[in-house]
């Protein structure tokens, strides 16, 4: 054992009683319903894959996460589609003045910069939006019609191998989030999925957490569409229970609605009671609103009341909260 450590370095061989904390450190996504299903947030020092169809809410989730990650250090956003919207970022709580924004053309240069940032140990989180926007230099400098089969996947695989090997060695806690698009799986037949993600199997394999993000319905006030509902499925989760489902809402112009999630949890815990369509505080009887949307909005718009119920839920014993793992 001593020879192995001398030859390959400290940490090359360990035992189970080395004092490693089994409660893996995480950073909240800023979305209560999602945090609940992934063990509290995205795991530090790991790769996360957010994938789904366009307009489902992937970038919004990534920005909400960055707002939380900024509390722990420097954050970077690689805008590979030239679609970064500072207003949307601020809406999700991001301090845009402190956010490092990168526009790098070639995939090779972009991946090298991501590796450099991650290995400094000074960056809390990196978001790459999107993986589909990573364009190999050969494609940029070549002609339309040139074939570059598998090149993007090979470059990604090489970079992610380097990251997954070197990040633990340098004690880097950087969380790298790839936003990925779905594309048609040409040639799929039988029970094979009709859709796949860009870049081959590299991100699928190296990501510790993979979340399928989809839009499942509209939110309306009368005839006006005011938002939509999002469903996140944890297709892969190495550090928590996989195959969990989180449902939550995003309100246009306001951001993610944690009020609805908090309302459901508080009702399940008996902190809020429902009588007909009315919601009220279980202790004081103070009304929160008529209907779920109104009550959820009341919680979202009053930070003091929201925080009071959130802290009350945290103080409850585990068996007093609804922790079902069933699919909706």
Question: Language-model features: where?
Answer:
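The Walker A/P-loop phosphate-binding site
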Residues: 2-102, 111-120, 289-292
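Flexible beta-alpha connector loops of hexameric P-loop NTPases
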Residues: 51, 97-108, 139-156, 189-195, ...
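Loop/turn-to-beta-strand initiation segments
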Residues: 73-74, 122-125, 170-178
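Catalytic P-loop NTPase motifs of RecA-like helicase/translocase cores
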Residues: 84, 134-135, 185
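Phosphate-binding/switch region of NTP-binding enzymes
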Residues: 117, 149-269
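Conserved P-loop NTPase "ATPase switch" module shared by AAA+ and STAND
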Residues: 122-140
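Long, well-ordered amphipathic alpha-helical subdomains in the mid-to-C-terminal portions
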Residues: 258-290
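Terminal-proximal interaction/regulatory segments of ATP-powered molecular machines
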Residues: 277-328
